[in-house]
Amino acid sequence: ASSAASAVYKRQPVEQQRLEKEQIEDMGSIYRTRGAHAIHCLTVIGQVEGHVEAPQGQKTTKYEHVIPQLVAVQEDPAIEGLLVLLNTVGGDVEAGLALAELIASISKPSAAVVLGGGHSIGIPLAVSAQRSFIVPTATMTVHPVRHSGMILGVPQTMRWFEQMQERITGFVAAHSGISEKRYTELMMRTGELVMDVGTVLDGRKAVREKLIDELGGLSDALAWLYREIEGK
């Protein structure tokens, strides 16, 4: 099968091969796979970068790169489904939540797989797909919204944090099996993280808490996507 796929790739025009190689290097994505069904593969790695550029040397997923890809997934009739692979430490809250809302609004079958980590704002991204998977060794850190840099120590600032957290908690509860109450309990737990509040969930615990739908990896996600596409 691999030799056949290689032969198909070699027959492609050189320009198309070059463009696909550049897309993988620049965007971390594949326009669409060449399996039985055309699946767009999107990777969310490192830090989700939003309105402010991350420090040099950090791996990032730029939301201005991801948004056009998600629009293409919805609009292009040749693309039949979306596969999101996550290994992220989190990042810009509003940018991450915006991407999660976009993924959730795609009408085509979508699946997400949490690999190394799906921390912080990576959690809404993981549950935004129609079906979520997590490998046993992956971890997800549930903790409150944080802010780096100087802030005004006034009640209005604290209320802003509360409102942002309510948006995230509501989204996660709406797109997974966990309740807002239970998610808040995990988020505010003390004694597990050093000098912080929150909970670290491995793959099995994330499924047990109904945060993620299913324990599984790439083949499981692709099998689910194929079933959904063929069932339409």
Question: Where are each of the predicted segments found?
Answer:
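Short, small-residue-biased leader/transition segments that mark boundaries at the very start
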Residues: S2-Y9
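Short, well-ordered alpha-helix to beta-strand connector turns
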Residues: A5, A129-Q130, I212
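STAS-typified acidic loop motif
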Residues: P13-E64
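Structural motif
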Residues: C41-T43, G81-L85, V113
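Terminal peptide-recognition signature
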Residues: V44, V84, A126, M140, ...
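A short, well-ordered alpha-helical element
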Residues: A54-E80
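Charged, glycine-interspersed solvent-exposed loop segments at helix/strand-loop junctions
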Residues: G81, H143-I229
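Glycine-rich beta-to-alpha active-site loop
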Residues: L85-L99, A104-G149
